[in-house]
C-alpha cells in the first residue's frame, strides 16, 4: 500500500509539473501571437510606404523625362 501511495504522489507531481509547463507555454504562445500581429501590422505599413515612395519616384522620373524631351 505504501508503494502505491508513493507512486501516486510522483504521478501527481509530474502531472502538476506538466500542467504548469503547459500554462507557461500558453502564455508564451499568446505573447508570440501578439508580437506577430504587431510585426504584421508594421510590415503592412512599411509595404504601403514603399509603394508610395515608388509612385513618387516614378512621378519625378516622368517629370525629368518630360523636361529632357522639351529641351
Swiss-Prot record:
Residue ranges the record marks as coiled coil: 5-67
Keywords: Cell cycle, Cell division, Coiled coil, Cytoplasm, Septation
Location in or out of the cell: Cytoplasm
Recorded GO CC terms: cytoplasm
GO BP of this protein: division septum assembly; FtsZ-dependent cytokinesis
InterPro entries, A to Z: Cell_div_ZapB
Pfam families according to UniProt: ZapB
Subunit details: Homodimer. The ends of the coiled-coil dimer bind to each other, forming polymers. Interacts with FtsZ.
Family in the record: Belongs to the ZapB family.
Function text: Non-essential, abundant cell division factor that is required for proper Z-ring formation. It is recruited early to the divisome by direct interaction with FtsZ, stimulating Z-ring assembly and thereby promoting cell division earlier in the cell cycle. Its recruitment to the Z-ring requires functional FtsA or ZipA.
Protein name: Cell division protein ZapB
Organism in which the protein naturally occurs: Aeromonas salmonicida (strain A449)
Gene this protein is translated from: zapB
